[in-house]
């Protein structure tokens, strides 16, 4: 027997070789054993990250060393060729090369390069003799070039849908130019590019994990171990930041711990779950009052969108979700043409291989049930509807009998599973067979999946505005003394969690936004860094009368440092490691730099922070009036 290592995996106390093994005499160079090992090593170099290469090496070695396959070397080489082909497709589609996927600094450098290219492409020589029409046309022309460049890099560009709509349908070119000018500022900003590249990094690495078979019920369901660990770290960092910050009113009389405010908001998973359940219960009660019936639908994408299928087309969960959204849009358009309205809720959750599927609880008039189900089934099965098992696996519709159980009961499990698993602890997951709990495990994996792919898990169809619901629940009874009767009734319904009554008072489940008696009231609040007008919610508006629900303004500040608060006038929306020093601006205490050495860092010193648990060293320094941060592994 002879073996050749094509990689190594860490074990306690050292490294274990990943070996190709052949018996005598087939292990000699004359039989191509050495060439086979070299081929494997060369192919493995094309796979990003040590972890993924190691996993691919183990899969290749397992096939190569098989004692049951007729031709194990051929089987292993076919596997490697197909795997590298899929990996190459993923990396080619990404704006990042292998090195940039792995290193923060390379992504920062690339962001600066792309922003600089856009700045050079966006240079405009305005002549004083230019008319407004000429200047507008010039801005639109410059945007078109920058958008084409940006789309080639990251498949999207800011305001591109607005630009496309204008080119197809026309409109006011001056209004368009104002919007495109803001988009141009984004495309010439390195921070904007860095956010986009970091997002591309997250999705590309997760896609690679999926295509290498690292996301499934045997390895890690719903999301890769890498995504789950990064999600856990992000949650831990978020909590640490929340604990370090507080809110202080403008007059300095009121101070609130940010962590406590968080616990009382819909950002708290339990409050979010309860609110969703209240809304769904209200939908059901309203439907019963209107004589409607409920149907529970489950829709799954064709097999070619599933990573565990032989037909897998290398699609990402994001692309699969886009496919499902498009098919749903077609079905709704068809129903709208024949005046068949529906309302309800959609829950998106992953299969164990990360492919999204939908659960929909829809309410409709009894006479509309068949045509609604026919439309949904038709578009769900429009692509590859004749493939094996499609009738059973791709679409199901279940009529809900109120005498056997409520509609809310059908959807409650899916809501809890995708938030915090409250009230379903210990229940078995159909996808993996594992048990739910509200601390980690499956719920954490689902959260990591939604976060990594930026997929909206819950979407209500029709009904009444939850924004108005939340805002009026902030009001106090004494605030409504001079309000209209309708406003007081709406407040009473919201204050007593009567969502069905709230829907009724807001004009019903199918009323247009313009027909609602109450709207959110917003006022201008300055410009953001791209010159875009910011809006601040102040309360509710009814018949030109404003009910102010936000009587105080708060600044965000560190609990241990009161001299430089975050506020809406002081870049409070910037990330915690990204602050700027502008002329006349106060410094934001966003940095993790100890106060006693902050001045030294501002004068050019470098500060290093060691994290023993994560085994990283983070370097902080000021460059071009901006605090930069880079982490490296120990």
Swiss-Prot record:
Q: Which key words tag this protein in UniProt?
A: DNA replication, Endonuclease, Hydrolase, Nuclease, Viral DNA replication
> At the top level of its lineage, which domain of life is listed?
Viruses
Task: Tell me its EC number(s), please.
Answer: 3.1.-.-
InterPro entries, sorted:
Replication_gene_A-like
GO molecular function annotation: endonuclease activity
Active site annotation, chain numbering: 410, 414
Q: Name one GO biological process term.
A: viral DNA genome replication
EC primary class = hydrolase
The entry's family comment says: Belongs to the phage GPA family.
Q: Which purpose does this protein serve, as stated in its record?
A: Probable endonuclease which induces a single-strand cut and initiates DNA replication.
Q: What is this protein called?
A: Probable replication protein P12
Q: Which organism is it from?
A: Pseudoalteromonas phage PM2 (Bacteriophage PM2)
- Gene for this chain: XII
């Amino acid at each position: 027997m002879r073996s050749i290592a094509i990689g190594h995996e860490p074990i306690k106390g050292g490294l274990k070789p990943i070996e190709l093994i052949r018996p005598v005499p087939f292990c000699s160079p004359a039989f191509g054993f050495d060439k086979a090992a070299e081929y494997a090593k060369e192919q493995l170099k094309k796979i990003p990250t040590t972890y993924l290469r190691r996993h691919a090496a183990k899969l290749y070695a397992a096939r190569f060393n098989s004692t049951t396959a007729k031709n194990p070397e051929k089987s292993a080489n076919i596997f490697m060729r197909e795997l590298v082909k899929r990996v190459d497709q993923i990396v080619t589609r990404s704006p990042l090369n292998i090195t940039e996927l792995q290193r923060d600094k390379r992504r920062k450098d690339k962001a600066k390069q792309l922003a600089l290219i856009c700045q050079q492409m966006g240079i405009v020589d305005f002549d004083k003799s230019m008319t407004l029409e000429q200047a507008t046309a010039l801005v639109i022309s410059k945007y078109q070039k920058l958008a084409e460049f940006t789309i080639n890099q990251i498949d999207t560009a800011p305001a591109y849908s607005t630009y496309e709509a204008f080119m197809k349908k026309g409109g006011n070119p001056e209004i368009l130019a104002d919007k495109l000018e803001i988009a141009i500022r984004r495309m010439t900003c390195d921070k904007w590019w860095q956010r986009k590249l970091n997002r591309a990094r997250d999705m590309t690495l997760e896609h690679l994990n999926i295509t290498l078979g690292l996301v499934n019920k045997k390895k890690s369901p719903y999301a890769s171990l890498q995504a789950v660990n990064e999600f856990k770290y992000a949650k831990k960092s978020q909590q640490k930041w929340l604990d370090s910050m507080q809110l202080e009113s403008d007059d300095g009389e009121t101070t609130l711990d940010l962590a406590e405010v968080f616990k009382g908001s819909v950002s708290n998973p339990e409050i979010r779950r309860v609110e969703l359940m209240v809304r769904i219960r209200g939908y059901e009660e309203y439907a019963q009052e209107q004589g409607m019936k409920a149907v529970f639908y489950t829709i799954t994408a064709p097999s070619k969108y599933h990573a565990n299928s032989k037909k897998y087309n290398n699609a990402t969960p994001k692309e699969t979700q886009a496919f499902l959204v498009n098919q749903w849009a077609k079905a709704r358009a068809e129903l709208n043409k024949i005046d068949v309205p529906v309302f309800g809720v959609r829950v998106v959750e992953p299969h164990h291989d990360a492919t999204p599927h939908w659960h929909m609880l829809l309410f409709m008039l009894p006479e509309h049930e068949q045509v609604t189900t026919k439309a949904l089934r038709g578009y769900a099965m429009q692509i590859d509807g004749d493939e094996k098992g499609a009738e059973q696996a791709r679409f199901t519709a279940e009529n809900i009998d109120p005498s056997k159980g409520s509609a809310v009961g059908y959807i409650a499990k899916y809501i809890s599973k995708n938030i915090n698993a409250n009230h379903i602890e210990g229940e078995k997951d159909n996808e993996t067979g594992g048990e739910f709990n509200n601390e980690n495990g499956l719920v954490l994996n689902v959260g990591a999946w939604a976060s990594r792919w930026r997929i909206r898990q819950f979407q209500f169809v029709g009904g009444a505005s939850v924004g108005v619901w939340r805002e009026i629940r902030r009001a106090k009874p004494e605030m409504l003394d001079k309000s209209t009767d309708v406003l007081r009734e709406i407040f009473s319904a919201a204050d007593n969690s009567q969502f069905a009554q709230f829907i009724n008072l807001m004009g019903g489940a199918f009323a247009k936004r313009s027909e609602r008696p109450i709207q959110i009231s917003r006022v201008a609040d300055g410009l953001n860094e791209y010159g875009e007008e910011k809006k601040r919610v102040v309360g509710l508006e009814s018949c030109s009368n404003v009910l102010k629900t936000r009587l105080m303004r708060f600044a965000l500040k560190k609990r241990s440092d009161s001299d430089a608060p975050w506020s809406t006038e002081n870049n409070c929306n910037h990330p915690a490691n990204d602050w700027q020093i502008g002329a006349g601006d106060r410094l934001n205490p966003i940095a993790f730099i100890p106060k006693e050495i902050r001045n030294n860092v501002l004068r050019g010193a470098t500060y290093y922070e060691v994290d023993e648990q994560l085994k990283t060293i983070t370097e902080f320094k000021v460059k071009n009036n901006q605090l930069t941060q880079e982490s490296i592994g120990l």
